């Protein structure tokens, strides 16, 4: 419901901008959301990293031939047109770490406090990042199953992925399946990198 109320304001402020929907709802119901939100130009279906990179190239070169970009649902006069489906990213470890230095972090920090834990609630410089995609279950009614995730050493270990966190006091690693044994290289690694808050 929120996108329907925000979309007219966004379009009013940026009348010439390319306005793209995305996320879970858009992925499962692309034509419905384009009907519901007439201000949207198109919908990105599924993972957006590679799709948006190609969209930037199209816009940057002035071509705007979006039918050549995989993973989109486009408006086609009164109908809709799907481009070739986008394949899932085979290795999430290749996805760059968030570039915190490019974000206006103070805007996000205003909403840092959420009641997930005492530590998070008291934080004033906090961001959330999601480190896995999909679901480990195989429900027959689901349109998609299967998991892809970032190696835990790249989440909790030292190195480039930790460097950006100096700008943020807490970065929550949102992970719905951290308890699965296959997630952890060793039991010691799990003990050294998990702190449970009661």
Regions found by a protein language model. Give the residues of each.
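Glycine-rich beta-alpha loop elements in corrinoid/cobalamin-binding modules
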Residues: 1-91
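Radical SAM [4Fe-4S] cluster-binding motif and immediate context
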Residues: 93-94, 98-198
